[in-house]
Every structure is written in C-alpha cells, then in structure tokens.
Amino acid sequence: MHSNQNYSLKSSNSFNIKASCSRIYFPSSLAELQQLPDLSAGNTSDNFYILGEGSNTLFVEAQAPIIIQPKFNGISIVEQDDHFVVTVGAAENWHDLVCFCLEQGIYGLENLALIPGSVGAAPVQNIGAYGVEFADFCQEIQWYEFASETLHSLTKQACRFAYRDSIFKQERYNKGLITQVTFNFPKAWQANLSYAGLDTLAKESTAKQVMAQVIALRSSKLPDPKELPNAGSFFKNPIVNDADFAQLQQQYPKIPHFPQKNGEIKLAAGWLIDQAGLKGFRHGDVGVHQQQALVLVNYGSELGAEIISLAKYIQQKVAKKFSVSLIPEVRMITHKGERSFSSLSDLNPIENITVIGDSNSIRGSSDD
C-alpha cells in the first residue's frame, strides 16, 4: 500500500490551509485496508481522519492526525427493466459522476451538479442541493469495519439518512470507511424544478438543461475554491420549531423558510448572516463571500484558527439578532482528529470589531 510520511496537506483541502500529517495512507483494496494500523476503538480511534478531496474539511492546527485517503475507483452500470443500478468507487469525483450519468442517459443527480468532493464523502453528509439529496437515489453502501477487518453492505434504511446527517456521523463514526456506493435510478424521470432558480425552467426541460441551470446558479453564487479558497456552505441551514418560526416571521415577514415533513421549518443560514450585516465582511485574510454569505473564504491565511474565529463571530452575531444557533457543516480537524465546533473553546471569536457602512469595511471598537 502506498503511504507517505510528513505529508503536506495544503493542496488537499479547499481552504488551502497549511497543515501536515505524520503519515498518510492510500488504500485501494480490501487487502490494503487490512494492512492499516489498528484503528479500532481503544487504540488510535481519535487520532486519525478519513479524507476525501478535502472540500468540507478545515484543518484547525498545523499538525493533522494520521490521514487515510481511500483510493477506490471505478464505475459500473447494470440496466434493469425499469431502473439503472450504478456502482461507484468512493474516490471518484462527485461532479464527474453526475456528468457521466447524464452522458449515459441516467438521470436524477443533475440537481446535485458541481458539488465538490468525492463520492465516498457524499453519504456521510447526505449532501443535497436544489431540492434533491444523496439519499433519494442511494441503494446500498459498502463499508469497511476496522475492528473486524471486513466489508459490510448497508441498505439505504440502515444508513439512517437525515438532513446533512447519517449513521456514518453517529454510531458508525470513526469505526470504518466507505469503499463503494450503489445507486438506483428509475428510468421514469421527471425534472425536479421546485427550488427557486429552477422554477423558471419549462416542465419539459431535459436533465442536461436542468444541470446547466444548476451549474449557472452555483457558479454565480459560489466562488471557485481554486481561485478563492473556501469549503462551500460553511454552516448548516438551521431548523426551528413552528412556534419559534412564528415569532421570527412576525418580526421578519420576508424571512425565507422551507417547511419540513415533520412540521419543523428550515431557515436560510445565508440570509440570516446577510441580515446580520456580515455579507462581504472581511477581517485580515479571512472573510465572508460578497455574493453568498453562507460561504467563508480564505484570502491568504495559512491558519485554520482564523477561520474558526471568524465563524464564532458570525455565530454570535446571528444568535444575538435572531436567537438562532448556526452549526457548521464543515468538519473541524485537530492533531487529535475531528472535533466539534463547540469543543474548540481555546479559539475565541474575533473581538473589538464593528461592521459599518456596506459591511465591507470594519473598524475597531467595543462590540456591544
């Protein structure tokens, strides 16, 4: 199995943060997975991180833990009478998969075009955009368990997908890694145009037309990480109960909201940040994107801690204005492995800053 020591991770995270690990492994087969050091609970389970393409990762410290970057590739298609079964290696690029499927006449993922990252990372977060989620087409996940050194097949139901959540962030967290994903795409396809920005398309639009519109929308709102380092949406869209929403709507009648099946209401985190006066806000070499307030950008910092301080500042401002808590979607990695945002208590929010004017300027003052 290929591995490296003292490996730089700067080009392996879309924030372009300077970090390195003592060792990185690149397993590409079951035999190579079985050659990994003992990562089962009670050994080094807190001191490693499974890295995809680094598009949803923030290295908080200069020293990262042991890194495992699976290299399972390949795509296979089995055509049935009324559906396609597509099996994909975890290391395949997500957007490339979307394009490949459409080229093969397999539709369903077009709303998820241009989402950065690998296929293996998609089920962990249950990625979603423009009214579609990964879980909508998942059939099965192949998962390697560290303790037993065996592969397991998990059904869609067993994965317990929820909004930006799955069993891989819960009971099976750090107990194994995803090697392969199997999708089920019905041949009976209808465009999902329910989301704002897509509702201007004709009902007869093709999947390629939908994908083109999604790409145009994302490109107009989200900066290219290669040009302006970022990790896409930094915070999850918060979900509140109907009573709390009623109070918010009374005060802010135009607040964007999305009713959920369970009766709760999903809010737009980007709108909340914008209304808090932080769109385009910049502090030193980190800031909030000028077109999409949900995206935090790195203008040249090499320190993940500076992104954390900015995020905590945003969190405080939104909580003060709306009494709504923003929870990061991006994963926080220290030398001990992944940590929750709230546990990073030694990193303080930006202090003595007041947003003035058009929110692109800042000045020092006492922050009330």
From Swiss-Prot:
Q: In which pathway does it act?
A: Cell wall biogenesis; peptidoglycan biosynthesis
Location in the cell reads: Cytoplasm
MF terms in GO:
FAD binding; UDP-N-acetylmuramate dehydrogenase activity
Q: Which cofactor does it need?
A: FAD
Key words of the record: Cell cycle, Cell division, Cell shape, Cell wall biogenesis/degradation, Cytoplasm, FAD, Flavoprotein, NADP, Oxidoreductase, Peptidoglycan synthesis
- SUPFAM superfamilies this protein is in? FAD-binding/transporter-associated domain-like, Uridine diphospho-N-Acetylenolpyruvylglucosamine reductase, MurB, C-terminal domain
**What does UniProt give as GO cellular component?**
cytosol
The protein here is known as UDP-N-acetylenolpyruvoylglucosamine reductase
Taxonomic path: Bacteria, Pseudomonadati, Pseudomonadota, Gammaproteobacteria, Alteromonadales
